[in-house]
Amino acid sequence: MAAQNNQEVDALVEKITGLHAAIAKLPSLSPSPDVDALFTELVTACVPPSPVDVTKLGPEAQEMREGLIRLCSEAEGKLEAHYSDMLAAFDKPLDHLGMFPYYNNYINLSKLEYELLARYVPGGYRPARVAFIGSGPLPFSSFVLAARHLPDTMFDNYDLCGAANDRASKLFRADRDVGARMSFHTADVADLAGELAKYDVVFLAALVGMAAEDKAKVIAHLGAHMADGAALVVRSAHGARGFLYPIVDPQDIGRGGFEVLAVCHPDDDVVNSVIIAQKSKDVHADGLGSGRGAGGQYARGTVPVVSPPCRFGEMVADVTQNHKRDEFANAEVAF
């Protein structure tokens, strides 16, 4: 079995390496038939369950993976900017969001994130104010949450790119409900401090802090400034999907001053994992907290995991004791 797994991993890495080389040679990552075809092939290769642990690959494969994630980030940004401009041409852009090819995926992802928050954050969840870090030119997640799940919540969307925020704000100009509850800010999360304490929930986009050490710094910064009891929603990846998005170690979240409440690794045709955490009350001023144990370390097997498949899946609150929770019906994840 181990030999078979090794052969499968080797074949996958070889395929991904070839796709990386082809994508890197493209003259542009703006939407086009060639770009769309290569990224479709890439996602198709990465989504199926795989024994690969991308964090344990050799240096050459790691370098390839890091470069590929940067290319994916650039291509995703260009795709979203393209559709944001297209949607902005309508008098009522929000009536035409279905033009974006992955809009339904955002609906499913946001539904899952909301239901995980409602299930695992003590006391249920009706946040008054939410921050989304890394919202981009198409803030679908904020829109879906505001329109479908959080009708009274105010949303502050943060992005490094002023042009992305300008594009995003145009989409909401004609909407008196959701548009009135959306604001957009151009800022680096590292420059946010006191304002973070006013949020009941902070969402951290998958591509904010692409290197593991950068992601850990962002999480520690959030832990230093978020209010005690506030929730953090982190998008991650698992298995071969780690070639597309950064993988977040739950222990880094613990070391950042949070208690991890739930982790979901979908195993269908989706990409992002979801981690739900809550600010610990014993967080230190430098953003490093104790988490569940000394230094934020988790005992092996005690990180609470939502077992795949998330669709009609079982909630596992304590892997060590194999304690099964109620079925989590009709929840799907996508990127």
UniProtKB/Swiss-Prot annotation:
PROSITE patterns assigned to the protein according to its UniProt record, in alphabetical order: NAS (PS51142)
EC number annotated for this UniProt entry: 2.5.1.43
Class of the enzyme per the UniProt entry, highest EC level: transferase
Disulfide bonds: none
Gene3D superfamilies: Vaccinia Virus protein VP39
One GO-annotated biological process of the protein: nicotianamine biosynthetic process
Tree of life domain: Eukaryota
Keyword line: S-adenosyl-L-methionine, Transferase
GO molecular function: nicotianamine synthase activity
Catalytic activity: 3 S-adenosyl-L-methionine = nicotianamine + 3 S-methyl-5'-thioadenosine + 3 H(+)
Similarity annotation: Belongs to the nicotianamine synthase (NAS)-like family.
PANTHER family per record: NICOTIANAMINE SYNTHASE, NICOTIANAMINE SYNTHASE 3
Record's function text: Synthesizes nicotianamine, a polyamine that is the first intermediate in the synthesis of the phytosiderophores of the mugineic acid type found in gramineae which serves as a sensor for the physiological iron status within the plant, and/or might be involved in the transport of iron.
Protein name: Probable nicotianamine synthase 2
Organism from which the protein derives: Hordeum vulgare
Taxon lineage: Eukaryota, Viridiplantae, Streptophyta, Embryophyta, Tracheophyta
